[in-house]
């Protein structure tokens, strides 16, 4: 009788272990296919980012003579190039993050820890310096503007997940914590977590909600003056990593060759959050055998999974059009080129 009770207790415990936090991966009940079409005369050497404003696609390049190329959808050709690469006046060093509005631009020189505001003329693609050069802490990796005077920064910080910065690059406050899906992850130093959970952002101005995607986790954070509060955290793919700390810095990487590469980009609209997902594994990537096509995972701003879009190509970076009906991307066809991905409806 005693042995039967032990077996019964063990059987009841199995669901508890199988449903541990590390296994609560997001799932979708709906999926749809999407067809890609390469645009004419739209080749890119090493793509970094792509954004759409009106008729123009702005494609970032890592090693071109210019770091930003302007492609006209109506003319189906590159019509201009911006951000000449170099170390002279009005030149830029790769890699850069760029943010454009109708009349302004914000350029972040990521590996040189500086940023600059500009006025922007969309008619002739000219930019003009505005204000002083912003010097950023060397611990910052990515920045994202959420208003005219506030920026969210991620990087490798000892005591927080995010920094909130003002227009001069000053730290206004510190916010946020990291996921703890890996067993014992809560004991890992913040600096190692920051190296592994590198973030990309999108922002909903109406909701004042920040979307943050790492390779394995999607998070929604509510912004109130000078602070971020976690609204929802979703596991995109299970992960496990190891880290090493020494006087020269911190090193962290996945130690599971069969783990999926996971999220590779994020785009947002007023209605949805889109995550560019790579289902290939670390092993497939190392052996240059990535046979699975990219997917786009769609969520609403409450974190509800809406559908999975299965594309027919490998996508490096992407953005969504204003109507939530098509995606513009840099894809492999087989060379890097700008294309459009149209889901079936």
What are these regions (language model features)?
Residues 47-52, 96-100, 142-147, 191-206, ...:
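Structural signature of eukaryotic scaffold interfaces centered on beta-propeller domains
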Residues 43, 88-90, 238-248, 301-321:
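Conserved blade-ending motifs and adjacent loop-strand segments that build the rim/top face
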Residues 164-166, 289-303, 342:
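Beta-propeller blade signature
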Residues 23-45, 304:
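A short helix->beta-strand "capping" segment at the edge of beta-propeller domains
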Residues 37-67, 267, 271-281:
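Beta-strand-rich domains and repeat architectures in extracellular enzymes and scaffolds
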Residues 77-111, 132-134, 312-316:
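Blade-loop segments of beta-propeller domains
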Residues 16-18:
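C-terminal motif of bacterial Sec signal peptides marking the signal peptidase cleavage site
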Residues 276-292, 337-341:
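Short, conserved, GDST-rich strand-edge loop motifs in beta-rich repeat architectures
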């Amino acid at each position: 009788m005693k042995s039967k009770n032990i077996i019964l207790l063990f059987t009841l415990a199995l669901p508890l272990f199988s449903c541990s936090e590390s296994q609560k991966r997001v799932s979708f009940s709906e999926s749809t296919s999407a067809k890609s079409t390469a645009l004419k005369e739209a080749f890119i050497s090493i793509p970094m980012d792509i954004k759409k404003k009106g008729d123009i696609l702005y494609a970032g390049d890592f090693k071109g003579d210019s770091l930003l190329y302007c492609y006209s959808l109506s003319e189906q050709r590159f019509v201009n190039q911006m951000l000449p690469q170099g170390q002279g006046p009005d030149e830029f060093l790769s890699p850069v993050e760029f943010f454009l509005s109708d009349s302004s631009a914000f350029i972040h020189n990521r590996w040189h820890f500086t940023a600059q505001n500009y006025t922007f003329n969309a008619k002739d693609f000219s930019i003009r310096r505005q204000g002083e050069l912003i010097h950023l802490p060397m611990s910052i990796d990515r920045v994202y503007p959420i208003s005219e005077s506030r920026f969210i920064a991620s990087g490798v910080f000892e005591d927080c997940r995010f920094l909130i910065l003002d227009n001069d690059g000053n730290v206004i406050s510190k916010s946020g914590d990291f996921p703890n899906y890996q067993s014992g992850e809560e004991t890992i130093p913040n600096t190692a977590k920051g190296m592994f959970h590198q973030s990309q952002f999108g922002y909903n101005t109406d909701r004042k909600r920040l979307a943050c995607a790492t390779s394995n986790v999607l998070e929604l954070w509510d912004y109130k003056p000078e602070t971020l509060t976690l609204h929802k955290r979703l596991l995109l793919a299970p992960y496990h990593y190891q880290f090493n700390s020494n006087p020269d810095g911190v090193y962290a990487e996945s130690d599971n060759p069969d783990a999926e590469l996971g999220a590779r980009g994020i785009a947002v609209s007023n209605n949805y959050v889109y995550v560019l997902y790579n289902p290939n594994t670390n092993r497939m990537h190392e052996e240059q055998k990535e046979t699975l096509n990219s997917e786009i995972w769609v969520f609403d701003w409450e974190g509800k999974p809406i559908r999975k879009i299965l594309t027919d190509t490998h996508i490096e970076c992407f953005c969504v059009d204003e109507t939530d009906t098509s995606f513009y991307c840099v894809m492999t066809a087989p060379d890097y080129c700008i294309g459009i991905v149209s889901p079936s409806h």
